[in-house]
Every structure is written in C-alpha cells, then in structure tokens.
C-alpha cells in the first residue's frame, strides 16, 4: 500500500489507469480530480449519470484492483 506522497508521485500512472476504467473522464476532469477521491466520485456521477453509491462502489473496486489509497 502506498502513502499519500507516493500516490502523488505516481499520479500520472494512476491517471492513465483511471482513464482506462472511465473513458468518459476528460483531461479537464483529471485536472479537477488531481488525486482527490471525492472529486473522482463526483465526476463519475456527472459523466456516467450514476447515483453516488454506484460511483462509490466503482471507485472502491478500482482502488482494490490497483492497490490505490488516497
């Protein structure tokens, strides 16, 4: 598990993985998200029309698969 500093240093790597998972997220969305979990959940809701619980579940699944902690 990585700490916040390590995650920040690897943001570009994880940004790519996020775009693979959620292709509707734009580069502008990624700038807004910039390592902030609540922003990611909100942008997934906005782009995919998901309820918060569905967006949250997707993020948890993604975090688990990628061993990512905010």
Swiss-Prot record:
Any Pfam family hit: CsbD
SUPFAM superfamilies: Hypothetical protein YjbJ
UniProt superkingdom: Bacteria
TM spans (from-to): none
Coiled coil: none
InterPro entries, A to Z: CsbD (IPR008462), UPF0337_stress_rsp (IPR050423), YjbJ (IPR026042), YjbJ_sf (IPR036629)
Annotated family: Belongs to the UPF0337 (CsbD) family.
Protein's UniProt name: UPF0337 protein YjbJ
Originating gene: yjbJ
């Amino acid at each position: 598990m990585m700490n916040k500093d390590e995650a920040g240093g690897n943001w570009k790597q994880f940004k790519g993985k996020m775009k693979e998972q959620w292709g509707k997220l734009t580069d502008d969305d990624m700038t807004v998200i910039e390592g902030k979990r609540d922003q990611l959940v909100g942008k997934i809701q906005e782009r995919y029309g998901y309820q918060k619980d569905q967006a949250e579940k997707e993020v948890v699944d993604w975090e688990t698969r990628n061993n990512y902690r905010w």
